[in-house]
Amino acid sequence: MDKNRIDGAAKQVKGSVKEAIGRVTGDKSTELEGAAEKNVGKVQRKAGEVADDVRDAVKSTK
């Protein structure tokens, strides 16, 4: 499993928590930072999935 999948998933969770804290406390800045971090995590996780798919495809052609 590609490291980006794990790191991306962790960023998504951290971003979701930060976003929720911002929403609950009324801190729009924290809420937006959390949403941004969550989206960065989604992209990173997807990049890891693509890397895994490419790696698997290369292995299957050998």
From Swiss-Prot:
Highest taxon listed in the record's lineage: Bacteria
Pfam families referenced in this protein's UniProt entry, alphabetically: CsbD (PF05532)
InterPro entries reported in the protein's UniProt record: CsbD, UPF0337_stress_rsp, YjbJ_sf
Family the UniProt entry places it in: Belongs to the UPF0337 (CsbD) family.
Protein's recorded name: UPF0337 protein XAC0100
Species of origin: Xanthomonas axonopodis pv. citri (strain 306)
